[in-house]
Amino acid sequence: MTDPLIPAVLAFRANGTPFSPLYDDIYHSAVGGLEQAHYVFLRGNALPERWQERRVFTVVETGFGMGINFLVTWAAWRADSSRCERLHFVSTEKHPFTVDDLRKVYAATISDPEIAALAQALADAWPMLVPGTHRLEFEEGRVVLTLVFADAQDSVPALRLRADAFYLDGFAPARNPELWTSAIFKALARLAGEGATFATYSSAGDIKRALTQCGFEYRKVDGFGWKRAMLVGRFAPRWRVRRHEPPAPLVVDERHAVVIGTGLAGCAVIERLAARGWRVTSLERHAAVAQEASGNPAGVFHPMISRDDSVASRVTRTGFLYSLRHWAALERLGYGPSRGSKGLLQIAADDEEALSISQAIAAASYPSEYVTSVPADEAQRLAGMPLAHGGWFFPYGGWIDPASLCAAQCAAAGPLLERRFGVDVARIERAGGQWIVFDTAGQVVARAPVVIVASAHDAARIAGLQYAPTRSIRGQLTLLPAGTVRPPLELPVIGEGYAVPLANGATLTGATYELDDPDTSLRTDGHLENLARVAQMLPAFAGIVDRADPAALAGRVAFRCVTSDRMPMIGQLADETVAARDAQRLRGAWPLDLPRTDGLYGAFAYGSRGLVWAALGAELIASQLEGEPWPLERDLAEDIDPARFLLRALRQGTVS
């Protein structure tokens, strides 16, 4: 169970310095927060010199606080003509400020106009206060802030990245000892890249001993303001004792990737790679993008709520919030997909479920902008028609046209994307550091050092995977013409089924759930099933069921690709041949122990959650390729790792 997030309380000392009543300590020196950040952290880590001419540079901070260190680092990056191409700043925070308090503290403490403008941009992008990883992008994606709202004792060990510099900036060790433990420093040591440096305002003896024990060399230098001394140093272990090295970028002769499949999964990967300067060749067997499940007239998107905050809830929460930011960025570029803006209402199956989820929402202390419980009368007001029960409302949930999203992402990729349609991929082979892609006629259709298989049901076959238990689920939609639903539905309503009011006045309902059924034809009993399920949530639909001529109704059939655990397959694929050869040695393996196939990645089995998983999955794959910080916690990445089924088979001794 994830602990609820408790926001910071904004307070000021008599001299105007912001401080935390919880820790009874100040957020920065009374001499000046900007000056302290420059002196202690930039100068202490030899920045900006060390990031110059680098492609990617990653800073890891313990304790985001007001974000002053990030703002000063960002400003230094902007001012440096020799800056790195991409600056990552990763920070943890157990008690983040609300956006209103963040704006107040900036207004009260920042007078520098450049920093104030950056502070405004950060406040405008400030995420909802829910636990987990939040990735924010600035400067057209060249400055990336990854915030982890969680206790550092849990979040730092869950990071997966290669750090170039550490900002050790929690409250004083005497006030906040949990942030200065050997366990924290050991976790940081596992993240340190070659030549990684650190700086901290503290010079306490316990800190020096812990740093030394974890492989860091330190030296004492003059402190900032009234502090006599501070520590700076570097990661220089005497022995190589790490089981796994931090992630590194894939070394390729050319940054060129082939993406197989152009549904939600593939188009998201295309955009994320092109945003990093990769040339992409897309291969699609149909004549256009989004022709299978991604071609439905609309799809709904929302996070999951569960009493235990399950893995699925955590992944969908991260994916949902990342998707919202990603779509907003597309809209700012002029490539906005077609989507609704009134929110989404989820209806409980009965009063017991309504109470259970209401209690889960209250226990998690979720902000109302994320989700709120609504009784039946309030739910009815939101929906514009009577409802069977109350439920919960997602103000930023809703519907989106998947095909428009796919088109927007391809358009955003611009000239870096070469699109090829009518190509039915049969298999791939590795030779000479390149992947060679063959069609069903045996002809070579593409070559590249990287292939991302995003072709749903065909993905495991194309990639040659034996341990990828995917299945097909037939889903039939029913489309009610404009004027059928009276009064009209105001927003998407989901529960046992779903009903979505479309922009043209029609109402989309669905969907059936038929395992391993290949029939592509519309069925009258499927239409009746859809309408009957919706009528259980929305009694007004009962009359539609009675009046409907199912044979005359329009609809669509598509097929969802799912795994046995209903989680997606996202990330670098394992080398199953090597794993089989070393099966005995790998019987007690962990995900990072598994042999991986160079340059081969998967993005498939998204089921009915492609809208909340596709953008995050694409960002994860791009981050793995580039050796960048991952956009979600390592344990969650392992729960969607395509190699997880191979790992289970190895542990069970069934790989041969």
Curated annotation (Swiss-Prot):
It is found in: Cytoplasm. GO terms for cellular component: cytoplasm. Its EC number is 2.1.1.61, 1.5.-.-. The keyword Metal-binding does not apply. The keyword S-adenosyl-L-methionine applies. GO terms for biological process: methylation; tRNA wobble base modification. Keywords: Cytoplasm, FAD, Flavoprotein, Methyltransferase, Multifunctional enzyme, Oxidoreductase, S-adenosyl-L-methionine, Transferase, tRNA processing. It catalyses: 5-aminomethyl-2-thiouridine(34) in tRNA + S-adenosyl-L-methionine = 5-methylaminomethyl-2-thiouridine(34) in tRNA + S-adenosyl-L-homocysteine + H(+). Its cofactor is FAD. Residues 1-236 are annotated as: tRNA (mnm(5)s(2)U34)-methyltransferase. Pfam families: DAO, Methyltransf_30. Residues 260-656 are annotated as: FAD-dependent cmnm(5)s(2)U34 oxidoreductase. GO terms for molecular function: flavin adenine dinucleotide binding; oxidoreductase activity, acting on the CH-NH group of donors; tRNA (5-methylaminomethyl-2-thiouridylate)(34)-methyltransferase activity. It comes from the Bacteria. Catalyzes the last two steps in the biosynthesis of 5-methylaminomethyl-2-thiouridine (mnm(5)s(2)U) at the wobble position (U34) in tRNA. Catalyzes the FAD-dependent demodification of cmnm(5)s(2)U34 to nm(5)s(2)U34, followed by the transfer of a methyl group from S-adenosyl-L-methionine to nm(5)s(2)U34, to form mnm(5)s(2)U34. In the N-terminal section; belongs to the methyltransferase superfamily. tRNA (mnm(5)s(2)U34)-methyltransferase family. In the C-terminal section; belongs to the DAO family. This is tRNA 5-methylaminomethyl-2-thiouridine biosynthesis bifunctional protein MnmC. It comes from Paraburkholderia xenovorans (strain LB400). The gene is mnmC.
